């Protein structure tokens, strides 16, 4: 089909629904177009569990996941930069070989694109949780309802990837 028109549709989906990543892959898991990085296509997302599950069931699936840095780099420079979390050495913390965490924690969905009676492709979308203050602030408001004691917030919310804080308020 028309890659430019498909790209524009994915950009609208990303904007309207607040996703960070929106891609379409073919039935073999090969990337056809990315909303963020339309020039990066032809690589495979067939190893992603959500893609495999859609291929198996022909039904939409959702969940959380971890993407390695090479996968997130395919989504564009901005998301790759947002993924990086500096590791600050602290007492009693497990020693790390890298000065930064470069894996991306995401909330993801994948849904079949059906044409007639055949699987034409898969829509994959995700929200990046690394450094996502908007998400963690919304989560905190849901849990703690903006309660305060003596003018101070009752609670905080933090998302961990292993022992690294990827988002906190």
Predicted regions mapped to residue ranges:
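Extracytoplasmic/periplasmic sensory segments of membrane signal-transduction proteins
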Residues: 1-75, 94, 130-168
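A short beta-strand signature within small-molecule sensing/ligand-binding domains used
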Residues: 20, 48, 71-83, 88-96, ...
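Conserved beta-strands of PAS-like sensory domains
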Residues: 84-90, 102-140
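Short, solvent-exposed loop/turn segments that connect beta-strands within catalytic domains
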Residues: 98-101, 115-118, 149-150, 166
